[in-house]
Each structure stands twice: as C-alpha cells, then as structure tokens.
Regions:
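Conserved donor-nucleotide/metal-binding helix-loop-beta segment in metal-dependent transferases, i.e.
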Residues: 84, 89-91, 121-149
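Acidic metal-phosphate-binding loop of nucleotide-sugar-dependent transferases
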Residues: 75-76, 117-119
Length: 290
C-alpha cells in the first residue's frame, strides 16, 4: 500500500495572486506548508500538484528545492490533476481486492491537502490518515470536513485510489471537477464515509480561520508564524501546533481579529443549490462575514 499526499498549488489565485510564494518566517508559504505536511509521523510520499501554466514554474522550482516531487496538470480540473498526479507517482487505480465501490480493501491511498493551509497541524494529518488506515476495509473516504469541527485550514481528505478513479471517470458537474472530491462525499448512499471530529469536542470551523485566501488571511498567518515559529531547525513543524495557536489567539486577540471577518467563508457558498449534504449553516458569503 502506498500513501500519497497531494498538495495542490498554483500562483493564479484571483483573490491573492501568488499567495503560495509569499514570504512566511523567511521562506515561501508553500515551503512552510510542506514542512508541516512532512512533519506528520505517518509514512507518506508527498507530491505538489500544480498546473501546466508557464506562470507556475516558480511552484515547480520551489518543490524541487524542497526535495518534493512535482506534477503539472490541468489548470482548472482539479479532479483530473489529483488523479493524474497519483498515477504519475505509481499509484494503482485498481481495487486491491478486485471489487468495486465498497470493496477497496488495502489498495493505494490518496490524501488531499490544499496548499493554502500553512498552519495545518501535523497531528491532525496523522489522525485523519490513521482513521482510514486503521480499517481501510470500512471506508471509501475519510476526512475531517463532513461535518467540519477543526479551525478552517486543517483540511485532510483520505481515500483509496480506486475511489478517486471512480470519481475521475464518472464526475461531470463543474464543481465536482473543480473541487476534486464532492462526487464522493456528496453521495453517502453510495460511498462509505468516515469523519474525524476534533477530539476536544469543540467546533471552531466557522469562527477560526487558518487558511489563506485574502490579504487579511496572509497577515494573520504571518503574525502567527512571527510569534510562534522557532526557526532553530529542531522541530520540522516550526515548533507549534493547533494548541499553541489557540493559546496565542487567546492571549493576542489583535491577531485573531486580523481575518475574523472572513471566518466561515468557503467555496460551498457558490454551490448550495447543487450540494446535497451541505447546508447554508456551513458557509458564509464575504459580505455577510463580520
């Protein structure tokens, strides 16, 4: 069994162009993100999945400098990009046991983590992947997003390569291609879904925002790194995780306020009429955020 973490990254963000290249604690945001992904204890291979656009050459260069494999694929069809990246890394789309949906066994595993989550806690990555690996015969998809409870920006989705292949073959609606996995998690009657809630019992998914889409998000992430990053090379994750971030925000409400107005803003808002398992209480529009 291979476990492949696919980190999607590009420079063409409309709200914050080139965000993965912006400096965070003396290195590009993507580098800090990859450090935290690789700090997870679960043995995985990591690949950066960028686009074929010439403007994404800096992403390819950064991945190479970081010692991480890079795949260049479709600019807007993220489902195809993830699938092709996994194929390029040697994963097999065939179910391990030769079955179909619901019988993927211990085949190769794809883990989806977006590159705009530079504060992701390596322990959260381990929890989600560990949930799947503990009983791969039970699940077609495991994430910590359905429903979400962790602060936004700790997104981890794990699935057998065979299930990703089924989505790649069958998904036709634009949002299913753009966002990679809705074809899977929006069909609980077909796919066996697992969710990993925050073990604290808290739900900060709509109140705390650790992802980067807007300039205010970048200011927030920069402030967190400036306050907590050790920079001494002894801790691959920078020496801090989710608990340390929350302690910092409790002590420094000025940092928390930097991007609070965008808490709860996500892509669901544009597809509420198309998503069967997502409600209006799981998203906000930017103009509604305060």
């Amino acid at each position: 069994m291979k476990v492949l973490v696919v980190v999607q990254a590009r420079t063409g963000s409309t709200r914050l162009p080139g965000k993965v290249l912006l400096p965070v604690a003396g290195a590009p945001l993507l580098v800090r993100m990859l450090e935290r992904v690789r700090a997870a204890s679960t043995p995985t291979e990591v690949v950066v999945a960028t686009t074929t656009d010439a403007g994404d050459q800096p992403v390819r260069d950064l991945a190479r400098q970081a010692g991480v494999r890079c795949f260049s694929g479709h600019p807007t069809d993220l489902l195809d990009r993830h699938y092709q990246a996994a194929l390029a890394c040697g994963l097999s789309p065939a179910p391990a046991s030769g079955g179909g949906d619901g019988d993927e066994g211990d085949g190769d595993v794809v883990v989806k983590i977006p590159s705009d989550c530079p504060l992701i806690d390596p322990a959260v990555i381990d929890r989600v992947i560990g949930c799947y690996l503990a009983a791969p015969e039970r699940y077609d998809f495991v994430s910590n997003l359905h429903p979400a409870t962790y602060p936004d920006g700790n997104d981890v989705e794990a699935m057998p390569m065979a299930v990703l292949a089924a989505a790649w073959r069958e998904a036709t609606r634009p949002h299913e291609r753009e966002h990679t996995t809705p074809f899977i998690w929006d069909q609980p009657e077909r796919f066996r879904l697992g969710n990993v809630p925050w073990e604290t019992g808290r739900d900060l998914s709509m109140s705390h925002r650790f992802t980067v889409d807007y300039p205010e998000d970048y200011a927030f992430v920069s402030a967190v790194f400036d306050a907590l990053w050790t920079g001494d090379g002894t801790a691959p994750s920078g020496g801090f995780g989710l608990n340390e971030i929350l302690d910092l925000l409790a002590a420094r409400p000025d940092i928390f306020e930097l991007n609070r107005r965008y808490a709860g803003v996500n892509w669901y808002r544009n597809h509420l009429g198309e998503l069967a398992t997502v409600g209006a209480d799981q998203t906000r529009r930017p103009e509604e955020a305060r």
